[in-house]
């Protein structure tokens, strides 16, 4: 008889003031930077930045996402998963979600972004308000198999504009830290 494993617990997302132990300075600098990650990655890559869409579809949102968006568990929403790349290397895995009802009311065509960065949209539209950044060690089983690793730092923020809330999670992959070590002046 096969033995089934219990589901892995969801991570505990924490704001900066509640985080302990605190990551090193270089990691914290990237985790808690409130500017555009797209712009920062573009600068680090000397404009060799690109976005590779992995998933763009309606799905049942994870319970931690529903809680962050103030939705009932098992709510349906738009899920967009991408790699943010520098020089063709996946530096960041990003997952953005929004409730179906909020997207319909909010007038944002997130499903039409394709290979464009969501960050461009969020930081160019001054009507969006960013909520506090939360961080965690992102669960390996939530990552694409090609980059699945234990203990990777992730961050997330909710961006609000009227009835629309988008939850954006960004997981920093080992290749990013390698690039930062090679080009500290570009950070």
UniProtKB/Swiss-Prot annotation:
Signal peptide region: none
Enzyme Commission numbers on file: 4.1.3.40
Chain positions recorded as substrate binding sites: 80, 118, 170
Domain of life of the native organism: Bacteria
InterPro entries named in the record: Chorismate--pyruvate_lyase, Chorismate_lyase_/UTRA_dom_sf
Functional pathway: Cofactor biosynthesis; ubiquinone biosynthesis
Listed HAMAP family: UbiC (MF_01632)
Purpose of the protein: Removes the pyruvyl group from chorismate, with concomitant aromatization of the ring, to provide 4-hydroxybenzoate (4HB) for the ubiquinone pathway.
Protein name (record): Probable chorismate pyruvate-lyase
């Amino acid at each position: 008889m096969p033995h089934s494993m219990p589901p892995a617990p969801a991570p505990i997302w924490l704001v900066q003031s509640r985080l302990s132990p605190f990551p090193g300075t270089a990691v914290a600098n990237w985790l808690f930077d409130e500017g555009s990650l797209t712009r920062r990655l573009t600068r680090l890559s000397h404009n060799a930045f690109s976005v590779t869409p992995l998933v763009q579809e309606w799905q049942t949102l994870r319970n931690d996402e529903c809680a962050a968006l103030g939705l009932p568990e098992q709510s349906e929403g738009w899920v967009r998963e991408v790699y943010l790349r520098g020089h063709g290397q996946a530096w960041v895995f990003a997952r953005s979600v929004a409730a179906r009802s909020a997207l319909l009311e909010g007038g944002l065509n997130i499903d039409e972004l394709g290979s464009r960065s969501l960050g461009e949209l969020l930081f160019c539209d001054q009507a969006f308000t960013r909520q506090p950044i939360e961080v965690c060690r992102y669960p390996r089983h939530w990552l694409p198999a090609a980059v699945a690793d234990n203990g990777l730092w992730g961050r997330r923020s909710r961006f609000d504009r009227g009835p629309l809330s988008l939850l954006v999670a960004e997981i920093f992959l080992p290749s990013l830290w390698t690039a930062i070590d090679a080009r500290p002046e570009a950070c």
